């Protein structure tokens, strides 16, 4: 017999959303630094992604 699922609490939703945002931010930082290091033209600088503050996180 089918049973309705319990509703996910707002705090759980917020925690999961923040984890997802954090993962995407660090992947953006990593890809930006990789693109910066692999740039073949010396004079051209790649545009920074939106929301990028320039501070790199310690690994």
UniProtKB/Swiss-Prot annotation:
InterPro entries: Ribosomal_bL32 (IPR002677), Ribosomal_bL32_plant/cyanobact (IPR044958), Ribosomal_zn-bd (IPR011332). PANTHER family: 50S RIBOSOMAL PROTEIN L32, CHLOROPLASTIC, LARGE RIBOSOMAL SUBUNIT PROTEIN BL32C. GO terms for molecular function: structural constituent of ribosome. Its main location: plastid. One of its GO terms (cellular component) is chloroplast. It comes from the Eukaryota. It holds the Pfam family Ribosomal_L32p. The keyword DNA-binding does not apply. Residues 37-59 are annotated as: Disordered. The gene is rpl32. SUPFAM superfamilies: Zn-binding ribosomal proteins. Keywords: Chloroplast, Plastid, Ribonucleoprotein, Ribosomal protein. This is Large ribosomal subunit protein bL32c. Belongs to the bacterial ribosomal protein bL32 family. It is found in: Plastid, Chloroplast. GO terms for biological process: translation. Transmembrane segments: none annotated.
């Amino acid at each position: 017999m089918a049973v309705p699922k319990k509703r996910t609490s707002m705090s759980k939703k917020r925690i999961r959303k923040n984890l997802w945002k954090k993962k995407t931010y660090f992947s953006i930082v990593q890809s930006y630094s990789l693109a910066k290091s692999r740039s073949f033209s010396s004079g051209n600088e790649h545009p920074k992604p939106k929301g990028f503050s320039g501070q790199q996180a310690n690994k």
